[in-house]
Amino acid sequence: MITTENLLTALPVKFKAAATQSLADKLNTVSKDPIVAESVRNNFITYASVLQTGRYKLEEYLNAVKYVSFKHMGLTNQKSYQNTFPKRYLKLVSEGRTDKEISAYVAAYSKTKLVTAIMEQSLIPMWLLHTDAYNKAVETQVELMM
């Protein structure tokens, strides 16, 4: 479960005001599936530094994190988009859009700067992303061995 303290620690300075109980609740109830919810919460915290690289809204960031989380679970672009934006997807279907048209929307979303930035950061190994914590852990292990 994410707390406001976790959010305050993880979010860049310009987003500290958004670290509210409301946001924590939203992240804690992001999915009915506990595995998906945990993945999205972890990714939201892990990739928060992406928010410093552009002019993004927190809602856009959360949606991009959800999309990338579904992609990392092995889902296709289309299924990831459908799970991230269920209402938007149903609207496209109810408007009679063809699979080809929907695929164009999905492809456009998957190539946005925000999604691309999160995907790029997700390719960086965790130990490299958190080098300082990794080094402290190694130093602690060395001390314990002595």
Model-derived features with residue positions:
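Buried hydrophobic core positions in alpha-solenoid tandem helical repeats
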Residues: S80, T140-E143
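Alpha-solenoid helical repeat architecture
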Residues: K71, M145-M146
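N-terminal, charge-rich alpha-helical recognition modules
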Residues: M1-K136
